[in-house]
Amino acid sequence: MSKMRLIVAGAGGRMGRALVRAIADSDGAELAGALEAPGSELIGKDAGVLAGLPANGIKLSGDLWTMSAEADGILDFTVPAATIANVAIAAERGIAHIIGTTGLSASDDAVIKSVTKRAIVVQSGNMSLGVNLLSALVKQVAKSLDAGFDIEILEMHHKHKVDAPSGTALMLGRAAAEGRGVVLDQHSARGRDGITGERRSGDIGFASLRGGTAAGDHSVIFAGPSERLVLSHQAEDRMIFAHGALKAALWAHGKPPGYYTMSDVLGLKDLF
């Protein structure tokens, strides 16, 4: 069976380099292209060398249309504007689009979902097995505990992360909201500062920390009368996200058009 040919978007970034390494270690995939923003100083550089590997002959380019002609999928952990630009091309080419980009707006998500009648999209705020299991647990716990338990989500990432709360924190927040039977946007408390007044009943709170090289720490706190339940996950290496994204791509290869998440990839939808 031939290997799945994958493009890495943002191949010169930290996550992009991790994806290149994951593909190099895979028996089921090979690197078909390395995408960077047009005008980047990295254009023309060898993707393997940038990832700390031997040269592989794949040069970074800003031309997704050309490199996608012989590809089967694209792994996209970039920025919202780049991901939205990539969505149209991936759909036109009929290749699987694995999206781990965070900071997307509701309108961005609507654009992504609009192509899924004719394209394959797997999207998740976090591609790791552990976090997706955590999300399933959070939903079940939120459903099981009554409103006397307040829900707070604490996350920490490295100092270079540009969006907050993290995509993973929001994913966990949505899981908690779903368990409670509410809409997160209507029950979200962020950035408390100064005299805020008492905590509003039913809110799901978020707090974000930034510093050092933390790959991603997340805790969901259920604070009730005289007791607290804390569900946590610590990412020690961003390679867990790269391997998860690669697993998603291989799973999506040959699937019918549609919108999928890591719960589909990992078979978690019927866990509880």
Curated annotation (Swiss-Prot):
Database matches in InterPro entries: DapB_C, DapB_N, DapB_N_CS, DHDPR_bac, NAD(P)-bd_dom_sf
- Report if keyword NADP is assigned: yes
| Localisation | Cytoplasm
Primary localization class, coarse: cytoplasm
Q: Which UniProt keywords apply?
A: Amino-acid biosynthesis, Cytoplasm, Diaminopimelate biosynthesis, Lysine biosynthesis, NAD, NADP, Oxidoreductase
Query: What catalytic reaction does the record list?
Result: (S)-2,3,4,5-tetrahydrodipicolinate + NAD(+) + H2O = (2S,4S)-4-hydroxy-2,3,4,5-tetrahydrodipicolinate + NADH + H(+); (S)-2,3,4,5-tetrahydrodipicolinate + NADP(+) + H2O = (2S,4S)-4-hydroxy-2,3,4,5-tetrahydrodipicolinate + NADPH + H(+)
Any GO MF annotation of the entry: NAD binding
Q: Which residues bind NAD(+)?
A: 10-15, 36, 100-102, 124-127
Q: Keyword NADP, does the record have it? A: yes
User: Which GO BP terms sit in this record?
Assistant: diaminopimelate biosynthetic process; lysine biosynthetic process via diaminopimelate
Which Pfam family, an example, fits this chain? DapB_N
Q: Which family does it belong to?
A: Belongs to the DapB family.
Q: What does this protein do?
A: Catalyzes the conversion of 4-hydroxy-tetrahydrodipicolinate (HTPA) to tetrahydrodipicolinate.
The protein in question is named: 4-hydroxy-tetrahydrodipicolinate reductase
In the UniProt record, the gene name given for this protein reads: dapB
